[in-house]
Amino acid sequence: MKKFIAGAASLMLCMGLHAQDFRINPSGYFENGGANVMVFSDVYPEGHQGGLTLVLNGDRRAANGDVRFEISQGQWQGLPKMRSRVVDEADNEIRVTLSYLDSAKHMAGFNPMLYPDFVFGYTIKVKGEKDYLVLTVDLDQPVPERFAGKLGFNLELVPSTLLGKPWIMDNRTGVFPHQAMGPTMKQSSNMEYIGDFNPDGKADLDQLLLDRKTYNPMIADDIVSAPLAAGKKFVLNPQDDLAKITIESEKGDLLLYDGRINHNNGWFVLRSEFPAGTKEGAVKWIIRPTVTKDWRYAPVVQASQVGYHPGQKKVAVIELDKRDTDFKQPALYRIAADGRKLVKQQAAKDWGDFQRYHYLQFDFTEVTEEGLYQVMYGDAASPVFRIAKDVWDKGIWQAEVEYFLPVQMCHMRVNEKYRVWHDFCHHDDARMAKTDINHIDGYTQGTSTLCKYQPGDLVPGLNVGGWHDAGDYDLRVESQAGEAYILAMACENFGAYWDETSIDFEKKIVEIHQPDGKNDLLQQVENGALTIVAGWKALGRLYRGILCPTVRQYAPVSYTHLTLPTILRV
């Protein structure tokens, strides 16, 4: 009997350990309770997505783990090309083969990249081993001396979740700083070794790299963060079992960097660097995310942020953990001065799975009484919303006309009382671009300017009208024409009227929250028409785009730069 009990206990223990193993799930990534580890499940490294990604209890903690030429990479640096991805469920391993370079992007493409002159392939393997994972990296060519310590495996740590939070490296402790701080260190740039891989590439090196001395986002590795710490064992969030990750290196040191030093949108970086001659066995990490076995994603209830017109369809969406099967009945409450009243409660429609989650739909279209409402699903609640006939009358499309479009107006000074959104800008527009070049952000210039102006000529009359592209300094003609058309149709078809802004096109002054008795929509139509007509008058045709000639000017952090744009065509 004792032997039977001991055997049963051993069996239960084995079953418990197996339940705590990292296994590849049907979606093709590792899962263990509330811990998920993706290996190139998606590929968008410019946006800090892809590569090795660690998600603990619904929150992304680290991402974009891959081989890089830089300590902290920005969106303008060369990226590898993925050759293959194998999900080996039998061996509980995911293998990805990549290579530097991607020749189609060297000196060419939507955003031309500049690759160093070292061509190699590599394989990243991640294998689930009980309650931890083993990551290895093997190169197919030895690292040259000139890239020793430059090439390495980077894992980016999400800064928004870490500011003010602690870390431990071996016996050293620290706290992630809210603001990027020195010391910095200088080193030779990879741009001293640009390869010659694409004879058809038409990017202009002088325009991209300028004098190679002043700061330039194209050169990301000459002044960087000095390491915050170095060691063999790193613990992220040691104070929080829901977010704790331990990483040990069995090959070389781990180094912790602040990637915000050389990129404003940089992340913290945990890195293993490759010495000269490194080939096979470049990296071996033991990754131990803390596993919360019984964790479940808390339901999220989403209704329309705008609210609903009484006569329209009304459906709330409920997002659940895929493992949830005991569905509750959603409930709709009406909120009044004397409290809340249950209006409707019934089983939701089972919509199905999408990516990591399961979805239900709760239809309450038949509810038409005006007022404040909220959808509840157990303890989860939607934001409070309105059902009303005037639900679109304020604070919806009006915000675009009142704030977004005025702030984006080019060639103007935009004030909001004693705030200056941006000063007079781009009054030097514009100079004709070179021919036969591949510029940034999708702009190219063909073999002809298609007008009387030649490369380098000043084209008069273009310093009027237009809106900056969202986040960048360029005027795309289709955006200018399209926005002006949309606003004109809103006026003609719906009689749309809003007047909260003064716009003086002669003085080039915009005053937000200072009505001038004119329809703001029509004034914005005029702003779009001004740039289009000015281009036609100057060129005898539409321009393709007016944009800044350098990367630093093109994607500014503030709106105070005065720049010299160029005209480009596709």
Residue ranges and their predicted role:
Residues 215-295:
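Beta-strand-rich recognition/accessory modules
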Residues 71-142:
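Extended, loop-rich substrate-binding clefts of extracytoplasmic carbohydrate-active enzymes
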Residues 20-89, 187-214, 221:
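Beta-strand-rich N-terminal accessory domains
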Residues 560-566:
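Conserved small/polar residues in nucleotide/adenosyl-binding loops
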Residues 310, 346-388:
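Ligand-binding face of N-terminal immunoglobulin V-set domains in extracellular IgSF glycoproteins
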Residues 316-318, 377, 473, 484-515, ...:
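Well-ordered alpha-helical scaffold segments within catalytic/enzyme domains
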Residues 134-184, 379-391:
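Acidic (Asp/Glu-rich), glycine- and aromatic
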Residues 296-310, 383-477, 482:
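An acidic-aromatic substrate-binding cleft motif
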